[in-house]
Design a protein with these regions (language model features):
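Sec-dependent N-terminal signal peptides
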Residues: 1-6
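C-terminal motif of bacterial Sec signal peptides marking the signal peptidase cleavage site
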Residues: 10-13
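Bacterial signal peptide processing site
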Residues: 15-17
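Edge/loop elements at the starts and ends of beta-strands within beta-rich repeat scaffolds
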Residues: 28-31, 73, 97-100, 120, ...
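Right-handed parallel beta-helix
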Residues: 105-134, 138-142
Length: 215
């Protein structure tokens, strides 16, 4: 296991930078890479590419003086930690290579969380850190994809790609759901797609509002 502190190696600038590639570009042997965001920042956005080195799996950029470090394994697992003035209270963008499938885990809380994953293959998603506002844009599902949300939010928005479906199971802490068709108690469906595919979204945390839409 290799720990890489990008700021100290001058790979990612401490004063804000353009996207910089990770220095451990070994592709995952299983076909699924894993990103874990360990701690929060004021704003975190995860998007599909571009990654400047074709073999690299992720790159980051930020606004404001800050630093970050990443713990990488040869199997394509990356654990990302933000730091800097204000305890990492900065705006971060993480760009993921489009080639592998991704398992994404967000553990740290943020004020604004944007997961624009529409250009990726998403194999699973876990959001354990809370956010004031959360937007999750999901690509066409190639199989049944689990999405677990255990971190609370004032407002959660899920955008499902055309040609895919999503089923939301709402926990008792969820106050209101907009969009989607209710199916039984606290269960909602949006979109349509092939059998045995789609997103299974389970929200077990508290939320004032969840919005379901189809792009």
């Amino acid at each position: 296991m290799v720990a890489v502190a990008f700021c100290s190696l001058a790979i990612a600038g401490c004063q804000g930078s353009a996207p910089q590639p990770d220095s451990s570009p070994t592709p995952p042997s299983s076909g699924t890479a894993r990103l874990t965001v360990l701690n929060g920042a004021y704003s975190v956005e995860v998007v599909a590419g571009p990654v400047t080195q074709s073999e690299a799996l992720l790159a980051t950029s930020n606004r404001g003086p800050t630093a970050y470090s990443v713990l990488a394994t040869p199997g394509g697992a990356y654990s990302l930690r933000f730091s800097g003035p204000g305890g990492g209270a900065q705006s971060w963008t993480v760009r993921l290579n489009r080639r592998p499938g991704w398992a994404v885990v967000v553990e740290g809380g943020t004020t604004h969380l944007v997961l624009n994953l529409s250009g990726l293959q998403v194999n699973s998603l876990v959001i354990a850190g809370g956010a004031y506002a959360m937007v999750v844009d999901l690509p066409p599902a190639r199989a049944e994809v689990p999405v677990e949300v255990t971190g609370g939010a004032n407002r959660m928005t899920f955008v499902i790609a055309r040609g895919s479906s999503a089923t939301l199971v709402a926990g008792p802490g969820l106050s209101r759901v907009e969009g989607g068709s209710p199916e039984g108690s606290r269960r909602y469906v949006v979109g349509s797609g092939p059998a045995a595919t789609g997103y299974q979204i389970r929200v077990t945390s508290g939320a004032a509002l969840v919005v379901l839409s189809s792009s």
